């Protein structure tokens, strides 16, 4: 049987021009750079559009089976200023709880719940530092660990793995997707901060909570994704004859202004999150 999905699409447009004298002098480097500019503008718009959808979906997601405060898909980190093993463990637990059956029981199809984390270079540095920093978040009496209270290092095998693989691309079975756009004050983080609107998040480990900064300059979000399920969809309109996705046309507004040559192009696409249960997050408090 065939099925169809209807979604709203939008056009991403770009236009460039250059002085006709460059073409007359066979300055192909100038002409080539205009094509590069066209591609860069479209890619930049696609990046921001996709990030806005992802961060907005995560910030607004809620599921009744979630163990996070307010049935949200986001938890807070356990230790201020640190992203620890406990936080990764809590993300796995949260993803499992979110993906319960419709009666909040065990689903017929069990998934890992989490396959990737999208994060900043600073969070990756936190992961690497587990090779030489304490990793415990609770004291021997099960209270929140404080400064100088019984610090425990990770297992020897774990620390050795982190030490030998400084440029690690995976950790605890999670693929690490490191982006410079993530992190305090960076554009993906500020998009999330705008969508979150100063929401408060709570740690599953020790029940501490904090309000995410409205500007996204003192806290950051770590995004967890389950890529075993096809829930993040990008649909692109293609030309019926050529199959091309991008349409580039000469700009006729320069027919009178003879000293300019220009062209414009556009791509029509649509993005949708079919099931926001594939998204979880950990808000890291640096305040």
Name each region found by the language model:
Residues 40-47:
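Sec-exported extracytoplasmic/periplasmic mature domains
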Residues 16-27:
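A generic structural motif
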Residues 14, 110-115, 172, 259-263:
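Structural beta-strand/beta-sheet cores of well-ordered domains, especially the beta-sheet scaffolds
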Residues 129-287:
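Sequence/fold signature of self-assembling virion shell proteins
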Residues 27-35, 39:
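Short, charged, low-complexity patches
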Residues 1-12:
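Assembly/oligomerization interface modules of large self-assembling protein complexes
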Residues 31, 47-66:
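Short, glycine/acidic-rich hinge or "gate" loops at secondary-structure transitions
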Residues 60-167:
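Extended, solvent-exposed, turn-rich assembly/linker loops in the middle of proteins
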């Amino acid at each position: 049987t065939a099925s169809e999905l209807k979604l709203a699409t939008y056009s991403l447009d770009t236009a460039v021009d250059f002085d006709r004298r460059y073409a007359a002098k066979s300055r192909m480097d100038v002409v080539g750079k205009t094509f590069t500019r066209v591609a860069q503008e479209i890619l930049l718009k696609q990046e921001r559009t996709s990030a806005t959808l992802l961060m907005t979906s995560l910030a607004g997601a809620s599921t009744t089976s979630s163990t996070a405060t307010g049935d949200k898909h986001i938890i807070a980190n356990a230790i201020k200023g640190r992203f620890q093993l406990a936080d990764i463990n809590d993300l796995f637990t949260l993803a499992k709880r979110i993906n319960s059956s419709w009666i909040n029981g065990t689903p017929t199809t069990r998934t890992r719940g989490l396959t990737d984390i999208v994060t900043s270079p600073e969070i990756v540095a936190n992961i690497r530092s587990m090779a030489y920093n304490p990793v415990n978040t609770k004291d021997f009496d099960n209270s929140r660990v404080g400064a100088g209270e019984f610090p425990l290092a990770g297992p020897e095998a774990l620390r050795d793995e982190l030490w030998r693989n400084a440029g690690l691309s995976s950790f605890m079975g999670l693929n690490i997707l490191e982006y410079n756009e993530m992190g305090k004050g960076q554009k993906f983080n500020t998009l999330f901060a705008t969508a979150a609107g100063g929401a408060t998040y709570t740690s599953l480990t020790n029940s501490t909570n904090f309000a995410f900064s409205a500007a996204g300059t003192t806290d950051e979000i770590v995004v967890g994704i389950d890529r075993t399920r096809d829930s993040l969809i990008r649909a692109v309109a293609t030309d019926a004859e050529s199959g091309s996705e991008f349409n580039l046309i000469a700009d006729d507004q320069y027919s009178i202004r003879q000293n300019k040559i220009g062209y414009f192009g556009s791509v029509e696409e649509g993005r949708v999150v079919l099931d926001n249960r594939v998204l979880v997050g950990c808000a890291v408090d640096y305040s």
